[in-house]
């Protein structure tokens, strides 16, 4: 949830508005001139800063002020600050902030940290089981997208070496993460999207129909980002094995929840390297692993596949060069922070976190089901709960929830929103459900766009038949935002 503005700030705003209202005509006349003058003063100020720099104490004060005024929401990685979790990983990041694992011999400690993070993550996903083959290996990356990009690139090159495929194709369900679209564009791979079934799981028969001589890989999610539903990984594994192609499982959300949910007795279908046919897995440590942002892991069933991830250059005048991931230099501080997070929490810590998260998720799911105007999308397997409505505009409900401080993700096909339950939600489940009930009632009684809301945009975008136009609008939006 968002935190309310401090009382002094609200009082200042009220006093300012009251004062200006007395001189409204003059204010309207002079405000453009004042704005121009202020812009010139700020421009001159920043030019001086860029040339001369600022003292550390002033920078620290500025950061605190910016954090107070603008960063009003808590972070996604809701660790337990009372036990010093954030302080610990911040200290680890700071201690190794200037290290770079690209230079293996210069920073051996960071290289060791990475190896241990990979090994601990792999152990959660079946590396110690005989059915895994005993060769699970991998690397840390900057996030789930890079992990997926590397898995796709490695699969493409592995299948080229193994089968001679030069016009690669991959098959994904429509619920798969958009990182696969990015990979297809980057690596010149033809992308086939297949529908999901009535339970919003990947349609295995549809996947089978699209497999041909150029297919390099198929994809499953555990769970999928939109609806929190696990694809039939075993069935996809059977397909991959029978055709001799790769199967990547996206565990970016589930990697640090599903192994523990299974341990707690929740009905979790198979999803890891114990499933024959799975050749690679992506899992984010910076989500439910509670590591600093910018830490993920990509894993492979064996070294033969992973070798196709690497880039080696022999003819550069700068010397021999080899790099394991897309980035050359990598921040060793983040690797150290991830290591510290995992070592600190341990199996028992993650188990207890999962217990609380899953209990909160089930309570929220039941609470949503009890709201007659709403319905749950499919049967959520984890802590992501998507819901829609045939009675009210769900995007208008989302806008009202946003005004109350809740930030939910808007989805399409069907129109819906989802909540991704974290530790931050555990103590406020009933507050969330009350706000949701009130928001639904507000929209039901007063339908129509919320001032400043995004419902009209989402609604219009979903109805536009020309998806190329929507794509152009997204690109223009991004170009103007960064």
Annotate each language-model stretch with its function.
Residues 1-111, 115-119, 123, 128-131, ...:
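Non-catalytic terminal extensions of PLP-dependent enzymes
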Residues 106-110, 138-145, 172-174, 411:
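Active-site nucleophile and cofactor-binding loops and adjacent substrate-binding regions
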Residues 114, 118, 134-165, 179-183:
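Conserved beta-loop-alpha segment that forms the PLP phosphate-binding cup at the N-terminus of a helix
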Residues 197, 212, 218-219, 450-460:
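Pyridoxal 5′-phosphate
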Residues 202-249:
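Active-site phosphate-binding strand-loop segment of PLP-dependent enzymes
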Residues 216, 243, 248, 260-383, ...:
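Active-site C-terminal subdomain of aminotransferase-like
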